[in-house]
Design a protein with these regions (language model features):
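A generic "binding-loop/recognition-motif" signal
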Residues: 39, 48-49, 92, 100
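Short, surface-exposed charged micro-motifs
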Residues: 32, 52, 95
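A short, N-terminal "cap"/entry segment at the start of jelly-roll beta-barrel domains
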Residues: 1-27, 73-79, 124-126
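Glycine- and acidic-residue-biased ligand/ion/polar-headgroup-sensing regions
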Residues: 48-68
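Conserved short histidine dyad/triad with adjacent acidic residue
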Residues: 32-47
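Short beta-strand His + acidic residue motifs that chelate non-heme Fe in jelly-roll/DSBH
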Residues: 43-44, 62-64, 85-88, 94-99, ...
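Double-stranded beta-helix
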Residues: 12, 70-76, 80, 93-126
Length: 126
């Protein structure tokens, strides 16, 4: 985990994955996702896939939105709040805000499809 966190800090995107799956075509994607404050994850959705996040360290806000980009709900994943994970159902717009250096375990169905192909919500958040 320390090496993945170090790579995230050095990455221009301020995040780095360590994949447990062998191929982007695998049917189940399981990964560590090291994320740093300031990383930008667009509001996106996965039309046919649920996505699960489990916090291993740090603090992350997971937000969901409607089709107009209006906030619907949020959860702050961290050990202090005793909220360790969340499942985002398929086709739900969502994003993450990294509140402190964090490590997540992430799981979703494969194969990999870039956000640009699955859907990015182009709105300006208020």
């Amino acid at each position: 985990m320390n090496e993945v966190s170090k790579q995230a800090k050095q990455s221009p995107r301020l995040r780095m994955n360590y994949n447990f799956h062998k191929s982007l075509d695998d049917k189940c994607h399981r990964m560590l996702n090291a994320v740093e404050p300031g990383t930008e994850i667009p509001i996106h959705r996965h039309p046919t896939k649920d996505e699960t996040f489990v916090i291993l360290k740090g603090k992350v806000k997971v937000s969901t939105y409607n089709n107009k980009g209006e906030l619907q709900d949020f959860a702050i994943l961290c050990h202090e709040n005793c909220l360790y994970g969340v499942n985002i159902p398929k086709n739900v717009w969502h994003t993450l805000e990294v509140m402190e250096p964090s490590m997540l375990f992430e799981c979703k169905e494969g194969p990999f499809v870039p956000h640009e192909e699955e859907g990015i919500l182009n709105v300006t958040l208020k």
